[in-house]
């Protein structure tokens, strides 16, 4: 009976979504990730300068563009874009977590959920950035976002989905790698959702060369810098740190790769 039911593609897809929802809550929803863009290459001026330069060229971002960054963290990317292009319109970020250690310059950050922001504002945008954030929204939240954002973008607007590439070179310990692989698999479902609602125009990779000491990287793991580390027990973190110590050199050199997909 179950085999017959699963032959129905619509039902099978619903099962996949249900599984993905369980995965999201298991991996990500216990607490917000405060440290992903703090005190690491992920928050360095060089990192955001290189990403900003590539986005400006790839998306042809000009000074009159109106930009929204969903889940902007401390606003480093928006700030860099604003400085590089001298934007006429102050770019806007939406971030539910308020970071008291950071005062943004030349940008406006709203501390709320993206759906609350869209409900309470009538602003129109030319560019919407979704950098490693969609997996943190539930399916219902994403559905509402896909519906509501269409009322807040101009005719030729671009929606930019930026996510970790599945060929990552980031140093991992086994449990961390297992959880990350599960997370990366969910990107396919997110892409299906986006292509159901928007048209995929183009894509390319952003490659950043990282040089960091082993001790600095271990401290990032202790701070649970990735969402997949959030629900690990302290013992699991310490065991992971021992694995990294025993399997990597004192100076880490690797490439951090993001995939940039542009929808319209």
Name these PLM-found stretches.
Residues 202-264:
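Conserved Class I S-adenosyl-L-methionine
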Residues 2-6, 11-60, 64-73, 76, 158-185:
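Conserved class I S-adenosyl-L-methionine
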Residues 143-155:
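A short glycine-rich, Lys/Arg-flanked "PGG" loop and its adjoining helix->strand segment in the class I
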Residues 74-117:
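Class I SAM-dependent methyltransferase SAM/SAH-binding core
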Residues 129:
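A conserved beta-strand element that flanks and buttresses the S-adenosyl-L-methionine
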Residues 183-197:
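Short alpha-helix
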